[in-house]
């Protein structure tokens, strides 16, 4: 499969999981997939086959055009008390690697040449024991004042739950204040924190 070219063979030739053949036939005919089809696409180990189908649809819809978002990712702090076992990022308060970025630090980053053309600022970080809603309101307002066109995409769901709690706010009140200050979306990681059944 060429990087930007149409597939040269029928989709079935790119599949290693025979269960995907009926889905590939639907894709080739331009038919809508069912929930069950989606579940199988999620469960199959045949990632190249799924990728071939996705490439087929993308090429049919958009030809050789590819779209992307110029995003800058920053972490406003690496200080975190959570100690997740998968995280090599965190630092404890007092650790020489520990940092908290001020709004001014973030503005300096956005003024650097590597941020030229950025349309989205993506920020996620740890659970800093002393940050509260006021820090985020100040940060969002200053970024939006200096870069009104940049989309602010901030917080995993776990961060929202944590910072709402330590700020003495409901999740809804915390988000209302963040949105009023400039927050526009969240990446969505950790949403299971809000559902007891999923967390269990």
Regions found by a protein language model. Give the residues of each.
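Conserved SAM/AdoMet-binding glycine-rich loop
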Residues: 118-200
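Flexible, acidic/Gly-rich N-terminal and inter-domain linker regions that tether
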Residues: 1-73, 77, 81
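Structural signal for hydrophobic packing residues in well-ordered secondary-structure cores
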Residues: 27, 31, 58-62, 88, ...
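Amphipathic, non-transmembrane alpha-helical secondary structure
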Residues: 21, 39, 103-111, 115, ...
């Amino acid at each position: 499969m060429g990087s930007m070219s149409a597939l040269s063979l029928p989709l079935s030739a790119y599949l290693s999981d025979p269960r995907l053949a009926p889905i590939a036939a639907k894709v080739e005919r331009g038919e809508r997939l069912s929930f069950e089809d989606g579940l199988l696409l999620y469960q199959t180990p045949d990632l190249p086959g799924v990728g071939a189908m996705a490439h087929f649809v993308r090429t049919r819809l958009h030809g050789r055009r590819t779209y992307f978002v110029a995003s800058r990712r920053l972490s406003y702090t690496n200080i975190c008390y959570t100690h997740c076992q998968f995280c090599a990022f965190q630092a404890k308060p007092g650790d020489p690697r520990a940092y908290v970025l001020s709004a001014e630090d973030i503005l300096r980053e956005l003024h650097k040449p590597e941020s030229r053309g950025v349309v989205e600022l993506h920020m996620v970080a740890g659970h800093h024991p002393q940050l509260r809603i006021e820090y985020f309101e100040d940060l969002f307002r200053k970024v939006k004042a200096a870069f009104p066109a940049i989309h602010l995409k901030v917080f995993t769901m776990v961060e929202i739950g944590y910072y709402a709690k330590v700020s003495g706010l409901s999740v809804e009140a915390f988000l209302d204040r963040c949105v009023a200050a400039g927050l526009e979306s969240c990446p969505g990681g950790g949403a299971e924190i809000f559902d007891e059944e999923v967390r269990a």
